[in-house]
C-alpha cells in the first residue's frame, strides 16, 4: 500500500530550478537542478522511470523489484538499506544498530530565512522550506532546510 502521496517540491530562482519529490515509499528523490524550467515542467514527468531491477541492486520492498535506493538520486542517504553511498550521518539506534530509514514526515514553508545558531545563514531569502524526515522504526527526526 502506498501511504505516501507522491508530492513534489519545486524551488525556483531567477535563473535555476530545483525539483525533488516524495517517492512512493516516502524517500526524497532528487529530480532536477539546472536552468530555469517552464511552469509546465513537473517532477513526475522528469523523474527517473524504473521498470526492471538494476544489476545486483538490493530490493527495498517486495512490492517493487525495480525500487532500489542505490540506483536513485536521493536528497538523503541512509545506512543499511541498500544505499551504498556515504551517508551524511551515522546514528547508533536504540537497538544498537546503525541501520536507518528516514522517510518524509511533514513540511513547512517559513517566510524569510530561518537562522541557525552557530552556523552560516542565508540572507534575503523570500521563503525557507523545511522538510522533516522520520526514521521508519525509531522516533528520530531530521529537518532539511531549503
Where in this protein do the model-derived segments appear?
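N-terminal accessory beta-strand-rich subdomains and adjacent acidic, glycine-rich linkers
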Residues: 1-146
Amino acid at each position: 500500500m502506498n501511504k505516501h502521496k507522491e508530492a513534489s517540491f519545486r524551488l525556483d530562482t531567477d535563473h535555476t530550478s530545483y525539483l525533488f519529490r516524495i517517492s512512493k515509499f516516502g524517500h526524497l528523490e532528487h529530480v532536477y537542478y539546472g536552468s530555469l524550467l517552464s511552469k509546465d515542467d513537473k517532477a513526475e514527468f522528469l523523474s527517473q522511470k524504473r521498470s526492471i531491477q538494476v544489476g545486483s541492486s538490493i530490493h527495498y520492498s517486495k512490492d517493487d523489484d525495480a525500487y532500489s535506493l542505490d540506483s536513485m538520486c536521493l536528497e538523503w542517504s541512509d545506512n543499511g538499506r541498500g544505499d551504498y553511498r556515504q551517508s551524511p550521518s551515522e546514528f547508533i539506534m536504540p537497538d544498537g544498530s546503525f541501520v536507518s530509514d528516514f522517510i518524509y514526515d511533514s513540511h513547512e514553508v517559513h517566510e524569510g530565512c530561518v537562522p541557525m545558531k552557530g552556523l552560516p545563514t542565508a540572507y534575503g531569502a523570500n521563503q525557507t522550506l523545511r522538510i522533516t524526515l522520520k526514521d521508519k522504526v525509531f522516533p528520530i527526526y531530521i529537518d532539511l532546510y531549503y
